[in-house]
Amino acid sequence: MAIGGGGGGGSWSIHGRPDVTSRYEVLGRAGSGAYADVYRGRRRSDGAPVALKEVHDAVSARREADALLAAAPSRHVVALLDHFPGGDHDDDVLVLEWLPLDLSAVVRAAAAARPSAPPAAQRKRWMLQVLEGVAACHSAGVVHRDLKPANLLISEDGVLKVADLGQARILQETGTYQGMHPYEQSSGVEPWVSQQRAVLHGVKENHPSHDSETQTGQEPERLTAADYLHEMDQLRAKSTHGDVDKMSLQDGNASCLATCSTADIDDDPFRASYSYDAEEGMLEEESGAFTSCVGTRWFRAPELLYGSTNYGQEVDLWSLGCILAELFNLEPIFPGTSDIDQIGRIISVLGNITEETFPGCSNLPDYNKIFFNKVEKPIGLEACLPDRSASEVSIIKRLLCYDPTKRASAADLLNDPYFAEEPLPVPIEGLQVPESKDEDDDSTEEWANFRGGDSDSDFDEFGSMDVTKTDKGFSIRFS
């Protein structure tokens, strides 16, 4: 069990919160991480099952609440039902709707059932639900920054919802890069980087719904924006530290590679874990630029791997491509064992990152620090997606491309002709939903054994290595 630091409450402190326990019965721990503990709970007023998320970092908790409210109401984004702000000795507690499964459980169940992979009609419905959730977030100006199968939760009746928005940010204005290519712009704060305080958008872009059935059924009673802002006003009035957005450390625009040493990479105990999370992602971003150390390595966009701190929703679109490719292959498409190995795997498939394939890439912070020999014959996405139709490969190609400005949006993909081809997507009620896992089941152990390489060192996998000192530090060339 992880001990929290942000609010000082630590693990199991939720049991000493009468404001929480008077309204919710705590049934047991459902999961634990470095920055949050999640408990199964029951609302005392009506017996509705809930998830009680005790977040140990106050800023992260409030940003997650802001992002959930901005994206609401959406059938494919998890509902925030209640929020209990923390204090000097307590952590924030977010009350969310209870969803017992995630998309990784669907992938594992399908992999275990090989060679009978999920029918295309089933796979299309899962894909559409993922796209609906991401489109809802993006239309609200939210960039998730940690999309992966484990963060796409599923109800027992098959409704998939985007969840775990603890690393999310809300952009100043919705949409993608506009005007000059972002990596050719000056180093100032761009108009689409995150605000320190989230804006609750009153009008959202409408996307066509692909849910086959009318959305009947009782929606969970959500926390309203007015209620949430009232709670935040009360909290700020009590705070002795001023603006709550200044409670964490500054990121200092440092990239992952710039803030770790060779020893950090060699001793990484999470390198093979399916649920590897970049703990550096909790660093504060007061300077206006984002941190590049966000998300889970296997789903991290190339610009993040090269240290970009100036990006938008396009990083989610790369993650989306990796997720959909995993639905096709039933295994990760780029299972890197380290950041450098991750880049190497991507390059082996798509070829080298150059100004032709990614305009402005030479301006990325770490682009001139790490070099790879030219890949004469990239494997190509077609080879990574065997036995897939041209339409299926096309969807992945529209997402897994180096240039962020050329990645297809989730809203665009909802209208891709692939979903109108036979076989048509099954209705949600026709999905084959895996059985709920036991609360003590650790699904990450199975995936922790999946390793793309057997090397103990990040550098051993690339053969010879040439380190050159430069006026800015050093550069590394692998062969």
From Swiss-Prot:
Task: Describe the reaction catalysed, as an equation.
Answer: L-seryl-[protein] + ATP = O-phospho-L-seryl-[protein] + ADP + H(+); L-threonyl-[protein] + ATP = O-phospho-L-threonyl-[protein] + ADP + H(+); [DNA-directed RNA polymerase] + ATP = phospho-[DNA-directed RNA polymerase] + ADP + H(+)
Query: In the UniProt entry, which residues are flagged as the active site?
Result: 146
Residues of the region (Disordered) are: 429-479
Ligand binding (ATP): 30-38, 53
Where Phosphothreonine occurs, the residues are: 291
Q: Which GO terms describe its cellular component?
A: nucleus
Which chain positions lie within coiled-coil regions? none
Give the E.C. number(s): 2.7.11.22, 2.7.11.23
UniProt-listed PROSITE patterns: PROTEIN_KINASE_DOM (PS50011), PROTEIN_KINASE_ST (PS00108)
| Enzyme kind, highest EC tier | transferase
> What does the UniProt keyword field contain?
ATP-binding, Kinase, Nucleotide-binding, Phosphoprotein, Serine/threonine-protein kinase, Transferase
Protein kinase domain residues: 24-419
Q: Which family does it belong to?
A: Belongs to the protein kinase superfamily. CMGC Ser/Thr protein kinase family. CDC2/CDKX subfamily.
Q: What is this protein called?
A: Cyclin-dependent kinase F-1
What organism, scientifically named, is this protein from?
Oryza sativa subsp. indica
This protein's encoding gene: CDKF-1
